[in-house]
């Protein structure tokens, strides 16, 4: 009873999280958005099931289908079954296809496994489900999954797939098998290669007329033998003897969720002969086939892999001004998980790049992780019906603006503070963008070094700065006074690399001010253009004012 209560609680929590991200739309807007996405998915369904082609990646289709279902639940519309084909299949399945319930995570799987025994794990092969009917030792009929009760007659197509045994014997002579027609792969590593749109490719080959030779690129993985032998080992042995060898090779006994996780991770990284999108855990003991119904299989569940890319909704478009004055665009997202990382923001790049992407709040974008786990945009997969894009700030900033605070300089000013506090500059541990914003909002800095004048009492009374942290922060600010001269010059934004600055051997502000363009040009990695930038920088009125202020604070190297 406790287990079922835990499962019920987890379901309710999942539903609550789904409702928490319902769009704030009027009924009319909701109807329009749902209708547009519904029409698009119907078109994709028609292309997939009637013509055997796909205009969208499998993963994108699945996630947008889930998004549609979520919207329908949010606004009280009827839900649709994801991946539901047109109900025009005329051939009855001898045994219904049940489908498989998805587990949200390892904990949910553990709860499910706790009350069951004699459990086995198989790869969730990514292809198209099929029923194989053998009568008197011969392949009598092959039926597409359809709606689980009826499907299309695929017998002639399947007979052309050389990997499917056309004759069997023994217990299989009069049997019904269920499995997955898949695209044969040589050494497919799911972690590296992803789904390659395998499901759509298989559907395309099965739905198209002619091209019988290409069907030999397909094979079948049998995952169910309704009313077969009681023992799983006997089932696997008979299937292997008949030619369905993959089932025995890739079916393993498991006792708990830890063992499933181990196998799941192994298959995620291993070279396999097919594309997968997770694992299926099934109990060897199954009800009689006459009790099988779509959506009612309690003896098996799936634990899918986390998608390599996730569809995320854009909440807002934000503009950031860097320390050099460049404007960059960031998309704020409804959070998604990618490889155990919560992604809430993704950098779009320049204003021009954003305009080329044509991204607005409400759009659905495909996000993945690039090198070092940095989120990136792969595609815009759906654009909302109502699209209002914000106006970017005027391009009035450059590398010599916003050393002093003003309303128009807010973002670049904060960027300069974040830069000077970084490890490679003044090394102010324990303060980032949020902390600088809190300090500036409360104490209204005049310029980028005004924080040097803050007292322990002021820091302690700053909203957003914990009292326990304020003493540590004051200590960090005091330690900064002992940083070398070159670190302070870097904090002022001198347009030189650290290597070039160190090579200059400049040790005082007065010495730096008298250095010529020719002197700077001789430094490693510093050409004539960069040397002119240094001259412009040191002659800038704001820079000179900051130098004088640091001298008054008796910062090393700035004293007269």
UniProtKB/Swiss-Prot annotation:
Enzyme class: ligase
Gene Ontology molecular function terms on file: DNA ligase (NAD+) activity
E.C. numbers: 6.5.1.2
Enzymatic reactions: NAD(+) + (deoxyribonucleotide)n-3'-hydroxyl + 5'-phospho-(deoxyribonucleotide)m = (deoxyribonucleotide)n+m + AMP + beta-nicotinamide D-nucleotide
InterPro entries: DNA_ligase_AS (IPR018239), DNA_ligase_B (IPR020923), DNA_ligase_CS (IPR033136), DNAligase_adenylation (IPR013839), DNAligase_N (IPR013840), NA-bd_OB-fold (IPR012340), NAD_dep_DNA_ligaseB (IPR050326), NAD_DNA_ligase_OB (IPR004150)
Active site: 124 (n6-amp-lysine intermediate)
Single Gene Ontology BP annotation: DNA replication
Keywords from the UniProt entry: DNA damage, DNA repair, DNA replication, Ligase, NAD
SUPFAM superfamilies: DNA ligase/mRNA capping enzyme, catalytic domain, Nucleic acid-binding proteins, RuvA domain 2-like
Family (UniProt): Belongs to the NAD-dependent DNA ligase family. LigB subfamily.
PANTHER family: DNA LIGASE, DNA LIGASE B
Task of the protein: Catalyzes the formation of phosphodiester linkages between 5'-phosphoryl and 3'-hydroxyl groups in double-stranded DNA using NAD as a coenzyme and as the energy source for the reaction.
Protein name: DNA ligase B
Organism for this UniProt entry: Escherichia coli O7:K1 (strain IAI39 / ExPEC)
